[in-house]
């Protein structure tokens, strides 16, 4: 049983390593590419994922009532997919004006993590509060932090095994 767990840990560790190693462009470069093409707006979701055998950054940008979803090739920086949708957010434009930045929310989650690696972040409304939903990988476990986008307070710290 211990051998199986050790083998599983080695496999999972190498998958996590290879995922990062395959991303030739940085997270910041991917965000810059999406924001440049969108000509403004707020990044509301970001993650590195594998799609059809290649690593892509998935980036969601909201500008007013327009939502743009990008897939950016993590090796070349090319936009391989763009979907645009008109959204009705009512009179609530606060999704465009969080007081805490994406990078600050990520920093808060990583600071409260034990040697974790960033996986995903999404800006959304949860029970009427604008929050960043941040996923961090910690070995065999994932942690999900809900961080108030206006105060930086951690509203939830959930562990998934």
Please name every model-derived segment:
Residues 1-161:
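Long, terminal "pre-/pro-" and other extracytoplasmic accessory regions
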């Amino acid at each position: 049983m211990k051998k199986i767990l050790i083998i599983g840990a080695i496999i999972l560790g190498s998958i996590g390593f290879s995922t990062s190693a395959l991303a030739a462009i940085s997270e910041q470069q991917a965000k810059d590419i999406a924001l440049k093409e969108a000509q403004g707006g707020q990044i509301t979701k970001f993650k590195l994922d594998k799609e059809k055998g290649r690593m892509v950054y998935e980036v969601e940008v909201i500008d007013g009532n327009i939502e743009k979803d990008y897939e950016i090739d993590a090796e070349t920086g090319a936009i391989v997919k763009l979907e645009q949708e008109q959204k009705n957010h009512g009179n609530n434009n606060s999704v465009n004006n969080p007081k805490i930045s994406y990078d600050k929310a990520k920093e808060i989650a990583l600071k409260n993590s034990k040697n974790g690696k960033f996986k995903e972040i999404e800006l959304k409304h949860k029970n009427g509060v604008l929050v960043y939903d941040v996923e961090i990988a910690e070995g065999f476990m994932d942690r999900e932090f809900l961080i108030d986008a206006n105060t930086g307070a951690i509203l939830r710290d959930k562990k998934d095994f």
